[in-house]
Amino acid sequence: MARFFTLLIATVFLSIASAHWAASEMVDGEKLATLPAETAQIVEEAGNLYDPPRHDVRLVVISDLNTVYGSTDYPPAVDKGMALLPFWEPDMVVCSGDMVAGQSPALTKAQIQAMWDAFDDHVARPLREANLPYGFTIGNHDASSARNVNGGFLFQQERELASEYWNQPTHNPGLDFIDRADFPFYYTFKHQDIFFLAWDGSSSYIPPEKLAWVEQALASPEAQQAKMRILLGHLPLYAISVGRNQPGEVMENADDLRAMLEKYDVHTYISGHHHAYYPGHRGDLQLLHMGILGSGPRPFIDSNLPPKKALTVLDIDFDSPELTTYATYDIQTLQLIEYEQLPRLLAGHNGIVIRRDIEWEELRPSEKAFCEQRLGKELCGP
């Protein structure tokens, strides 16, 4: 009799489980059927494509889309990422810079305008047609803020044409602006109770008057009454990749900038430029170093890991102490890049970055010693 009841319970359990699995497959099938044909084909070819659980707000974050100087074409990874947006159904798309392939004095006005036209074809126009807001920061290949010996901008024409493109009413990125007086270089906007600030991190230097504007914006009631604050910039605070581990490739006075951002409770700084995805933190500031979709992914410093092109689905849960979760995909394979696959810390020339799931106190003595021997204690603290 006991054996009969055991078999009966097992049969009932299997029936319920089978129904649940079938329902899950049906839901997936229903979602697949609603997707555009191009999206559905990519999802089917990927096999078990991870669909992260939704929370309050979802961003898809991309970066560094460009290829060679003057190019008006984009790598397949860019088009693939754009095609997958209907699968992830973000509330907004965010880009941490380098949307076009400028920063060359040899480029003519017509060539620069052609690059922005190509960007519009591949990225901006599809987003507008999908009614997806697009928050972004200017990169060095978009409109570098590097200056000459007289203090003028080396790439003045590129800056003028970038501003011209973005300020055309037909190119409205669909943002709820708060301050757009110096858009697209320095501006603020809000989205679903999140305050966003974009600064011009297209070079390592931010002038004092612009830093004053940044601080004033972060101190404003709009910023402080928001549930969360996010900063967008191109150059990161600290170096993480080979070929970028030197002054000029990160923001000057990184620790001072971080202290200011922490003072106003900025949660996350989203950056690009180093062409490597690394989910890090330093102190109380989350540092999302974005992978690229364009040309030239870079390896991490002190690592043998192969470089990967990647994009990140960032979900925000206002009830969670962590606020954010990342689902980052190798855009070639569409496999998730897990935290455990990445270095536990990176010790670039101007300071340590720790992987976001690890605290300073959890680092091994050998890891702390490695950093301190290279950089000294001041640059290796929590």
Where are these regions (language model features)?
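Extended active-site neighborhood of metal-dependent phosphoesterases/phosphodiesterases
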Residues: 26-49, 105, 109-224, 256-262, ...
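Active-site glycine-centered loops adjacent to acidic/histidine catalytic or metal-binding residues
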Residues: 64, 97-98, 139-140, 234, ...
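Short, solvent-exposed loop/turn elements at domain surfaces
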Residues: 67-73, 102, 206-208, 240, ...
